[in-house]
Amino acid sequence: MTAQQQLVEIDQVNVEYPVKGWRRPPFRALSDISLTIGAGETVGLVGESGSGKTTLGRAILGLAPVTGGEIRFEGRVISTLGRRERQALSKDIQVVFQDPYTSLNPAMTVNDILTEPLLVTGTSRKDADRRVRDLLDEVHLPADAGRRLPREFSGGQRQRIAIARALSRDPKLIVCDEPVSALDLSTQATVLDLFIEIQDRTGVAYLFVTHDLSVVRHISHRVAVMHRGAIVEQGDAATVTSTPSEPYTQRLLLAAPVPDPIRQAVRREERRAFAAETAAAVG
């Protein structure tokens, strides 16, 4: 993929937070991160809790302080934008969070939730209502869903509503922050398939943040693995999730559960052997 086709370019980005105390150095959450996301591409960002993967998503959204390097969107530096410029950019960059229930206003109907971002940007009520009908159809929810409240839906259905809201203004990039981790396995699969279906139809790009290598294997074109604020491995999704070169990625792969109890037992033994081998190498 050429540079002209890159939608997002993350170039040597650092994110630091001040630490209370006299002359204490700031906490560096991200260190020299470089990554690209192409138009219509899904890049999976995987790592354990505290690895910095969510912070990178927040940096793209303008919610984390970039203290070094820069983030470019369609060739334009966005890591230094002010609030007003950021608001204008929200048409092109949207987000889907982990817990749809907390990200949806419980007092608003689905119709109000989906029309709000359209009406505030000048869309007429008639066009907004038409767009909502289309959005509900795109995420496979019934037409009468618009009259109901978020609490009347299952977790998977609520996440479909959150996806519909993110799609309402036809974004070019959606940052997906652990969007299926709160769902059961069967629902995860249907929501992941929905993300793929939407991408095939619209050409939207995803940064897919997760701790689960099996999820990124299912949905991603490329994968970047994060550990302690740095990218330790990146490459083609099939390669990284099957034959990783970094010990940390190998550990993540062995930690992922599998439904077959025999394979799970084998993986458990492989994990123990790998841990013993790593300890011996360190010693």
Region spans (language model):
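Proline-centered turn/helix-capping motifs that create local helix->coil transitions or kinks
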Residues: 260-264
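ABC transporter nucleotide-binding domains
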Residues: 1-255, 267-283
